[in-house]
């Protein structure tokens, strides 16, 4: 009787344990999928949500096994290297950039090696979460079917999200927390989206092969999922994603065929690769163009940019301590070292995961990372039959290709991709595990879980509620709040917010710029000058910094505004005309100190002359134009396009008699000044000469194509049936002119030209009719109506 009662209780315990294990397995496999879904966890609140779930898992099911003394030593040393940044800076080599920040710019840096310890601490906690995740997935005591379950659940989750990405892209919509500019996928960086799809594609091959081997029809579903992944990878426009998918598939199929030692298996693998390549070409015929295989000259552009970024990164490494500059400091400090890699955008990273790691943690961290990967890969072997060898090989290939790709990209520095790769690497291990249990590991990771839970929850709450939490979250909140107070005119509060945030991020140029603008409004001139100088030093590329400085100084210290604007023009590069045009406000043009200087700048630079002439008053236009011609009488510095634009503006706003006088002296300028000359001829009553100039030098007019050769009678019948059809109207006009029926053609053209929204070319056709009738004045007037309609249409 007692045994009968114990048996159901034992079954209940077994069922409860099985349910618990199933939930735990599903949670582990779903965490990287959740990170991908939450915008790739690129925002701090998204990362906080992911780490919160990881922390809860650590508290509920902490790792019970140890990875071994050597692996533990490597991971512990990596964490210590990251924490070295909090040691006193005086213990290490003092780089020149730190001396410049402290001595020249008088920035109050903390005494730690990292110039921004609160920012470094934020990233250190994320690093600790990554190491904890590695330990969790690598020490799971799983049965072989549980390994398959986790890998299949992860792969199907990514395939489902790929399908959702395609659906959103087709519907021209997206989720609020997805950050891609093209509305495809969650990541802002297309390579991170493509890489994750490529990894999933490799895993799909293993899943499909396993179902096919076991005689299950699920392999059909996996093939459909692979099609979705291929389409999504192509739509992501990621070369690296396509490369990982194709190369990884080739390695896995090659290894599969080699292990089978069967010609049919080899043929099947080759056939599948050819089929995959065919699918890629069918979906995207320009795939080779994207890999730049057709144009070696253009291929060298991106390669050259990489090498220049790498060159400047190595300059930063040489000018920094052996242990790096600390987490979270690359962007701020690298801007100071950009010499060989100039550009109009701020470099957020060195285009390489490995160089990024080297810069922030030093070369020992790179060596230890390679050793750690080697130790983990060593635990993958042997790949014997009956050990999920197909799944594990696919996971290993995917992880290694991702690490290799990290040489020239930075996908490993995002939670959404890093957690996925760590998951695959951890499940590629040979099981059952040959690891020793350790009670200390459970205690350690529960403590880590508590720390991560507290910090991640605080991060989520602070990010969503714009709380001033010390670290990167608080800095972002302070920027948003200071923007609000600045718009409201509460400049004292703006200064207070930015000053507080600068204690956490003393190398943030945006904070100095915002504070400086507020200081100008409060007449704190000395402080504003210092903060503007700091902002320009920390952001030496963007023209927006000195442009904003000049705008702030203009009402109070005009000469300081001019100095800042000169720097903005120096930085602007090809954007100089737009930047200069933004300076030509009513306030600057009416300022007695600024206006002459802006005129001097505009009339001495060929690319700035047109913005200046467009902005000056009609009374000043002719005087400014005369000065321009004195500075450059032959317009040698102007390009052909600039000459055409200059004379078009001159014809519109200038003195037509002066244009005539200049063209008489310089006959070769007639091809630029023909419109002004035509207006001059018309003003003198010579409408024929005016009209003929438009026909000689005017641009060809776009008119509808005539594909049919219908008779005049047929066209008249069609026109009477559809009198509002522009195409039929043009065909009828054309047939009437060919048959010499000019008066009827004129009526047809005017039928449309007198309507307000008709195409501009009907005015042109009307002008042709009047010219055919020798009525040159009306031909000229009709052509002017055509030109004005075209101008309105382009605005």
Language model: regions and residue ranges:
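Loop-to-helix entry and N-terminal half of a specific, functionally important transmembrane alpha helix
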Residues: 26-33, 155-158, 221-227, 348, ...
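Transmembrane alpha-helices of multi-pass inner-membrane enzymes
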Residues: 53-58, 202-204, 244-253, 274-275, ...
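Soluble catalytic regions of membrane-associated enzymes that act on cell-envelope
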Residues: 461-669, 678, 683-684, 698
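Hydrophobic alpha-helical transmembrane segments
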Residues: 77-90, 129, 146-176, 188, ...
């Amino acid at each position: 009787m007692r045994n009968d009662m114990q048996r159901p209780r034992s079954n209940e315990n077994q069922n409860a344990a099985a349910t618990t294990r199933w939930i735990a397995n599903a949670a582990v496999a779903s965490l990287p999928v959740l990170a991908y879904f939450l915008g790739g966890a690129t925002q701090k609140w998204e990362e906080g949500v992911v780490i919160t779930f990881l922390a809860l898992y650590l508290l509920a099911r902490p790792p019970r096994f140890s990875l071994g003394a050597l692996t533990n030593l490597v991971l512990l040393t990596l964490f210590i290297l990251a924490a070295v940044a909090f040691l006193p800076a005086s213990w290490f080599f003092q780089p020149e950039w730190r001396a410049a920040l402290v001595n020249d710019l008088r920035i109050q840096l903390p005494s730690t090696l990292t110039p921004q310890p609160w920012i470094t601490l934020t990233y250190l906690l994320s690093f600790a979460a990554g190491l904890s995740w590695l330990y969790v997935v690598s020490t799971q005591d799983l049965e072989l079917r549980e390994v398959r379950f986790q890998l299949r659940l992860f792969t199907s989750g990514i395939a489902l999200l790929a399908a959702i990405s395609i659906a959103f892209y087709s519907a021209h919509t997206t989720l609020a927390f997805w950050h891609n500019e093209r509305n495809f996928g969650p990541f802002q960086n297309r390579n991170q989206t493509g890489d994750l799809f490529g990894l999933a594609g490799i895993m799909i091959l293993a899943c499909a092969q396993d179902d096919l081997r076991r005689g299950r029809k699920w392999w059909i579903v996996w093939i459909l999922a692979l099609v979705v992944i291929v389409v999504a990878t192509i739509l992501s426009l990621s070369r690296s994603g396509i490369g990982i998918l194709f190369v990884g598939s080739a390695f896995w199929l090659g290894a599969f065929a080699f292990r089978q030692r069967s010609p049919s298996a080899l043929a099947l693998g080759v056939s599948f690769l050819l089929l995959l390549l065919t699918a890629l070409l069918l979906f995207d015929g320009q795939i080779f163009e994207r890999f730049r295989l057709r144009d070696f000259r253009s291929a060298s552009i991106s390669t050259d940019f990489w090498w220049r970024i790498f060159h400047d990164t190595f300059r930063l490494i040489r000018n920094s301590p052996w242990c790096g500059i600390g987490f979270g400091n690359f962007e701020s400090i690298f801007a100071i070292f950009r010499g060989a890699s100039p550009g109009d955008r701020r470099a957020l990273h060195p285009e390489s995961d490995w160089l990024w790691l080297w810069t922030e943690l030093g070369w020992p961290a790179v060596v230890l990372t390679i050793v750690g990967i080697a130790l983990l890969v060593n635990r993958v072997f042997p790949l014997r039959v009956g050990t999920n060898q197909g799944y594990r090989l696919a996971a290993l290939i995917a992880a290694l290709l991702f690490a290799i790709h990290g040489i020239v990209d930075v996908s490993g520095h995002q939670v959404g991709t890093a957690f996925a790769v760590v998951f695959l690497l951890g499940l590629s291990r040979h099981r059952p595990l040959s690891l020793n249990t350790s009670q200390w590991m459970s205690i350690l990771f529960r403590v880590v879980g508590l720390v991560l839970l507290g910090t991640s929850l605080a991060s989520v709450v602070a990010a969503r509620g714009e709380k001033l939490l010390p670290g990167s979250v608080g800095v972002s909140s302070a920027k948003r709040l200071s923007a609000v107070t600045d718009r409201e005119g509460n400049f004292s509060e703006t200064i207070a917010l930015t000053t507080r945030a600068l204690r956490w991020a003393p190398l943030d140029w945006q904070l100095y710029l915002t504070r400086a603008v507020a200081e100008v409004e409060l007449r704190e001139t000395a402080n504003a000058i210092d903060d503007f100088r700091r902002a320009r030093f920390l952001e030496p590329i963007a023209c927006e910094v000195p442009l904003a400085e000049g705008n702030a100084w203009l009402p109070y210290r005009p000469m300081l505004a001019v100095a800042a604007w000169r720097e903005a023009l120096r930085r602007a590069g090809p954007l100089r005309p737009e930047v200069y045009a933004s300076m030509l406000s009513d306030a600057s043009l009416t300022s007695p100190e600024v206006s002459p200087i802006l005129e001097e700048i505009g009339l001495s630079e060929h690319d700035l002359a047109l913005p200046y002439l467009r902005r000056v008053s009609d009374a000043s236009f002719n005087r400014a134009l005369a000065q321009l011609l004195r500075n450059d009488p032959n317009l040698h510095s102007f390009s052909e396009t600039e000459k055409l634009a200059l004379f078009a503006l001159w014809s519109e706003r200038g003195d037509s008699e002066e244009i005539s006088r200049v063209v008489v002296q310089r006959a070769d300028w007639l091809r630029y000044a023909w419109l002004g000359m035509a207006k001059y001829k018309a003003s003198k009553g010579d409408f024929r000469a005016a009209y003929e100039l438009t026909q000689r030098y005017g641009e060809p007019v776009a008119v509808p194509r005539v594909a049919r050769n219908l008779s005049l009678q047929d066209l008249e019948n069609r026109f009477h049936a559809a009198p509002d059809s522009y195409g039929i109207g043009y065909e009828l006009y054309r047939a009437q002119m060919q048959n010499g029926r000019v008066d009827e053609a004129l009526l047809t053209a005017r039928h449309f030209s007198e309507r307000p929204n008709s195409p501009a070319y009907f005015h042109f056709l009307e002008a042709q009719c009047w010219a055919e009738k020798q009525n040159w004045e009306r031909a000229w007037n009709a052509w002017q109506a055509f030109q004005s309609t075209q101008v309105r249409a382009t605005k």
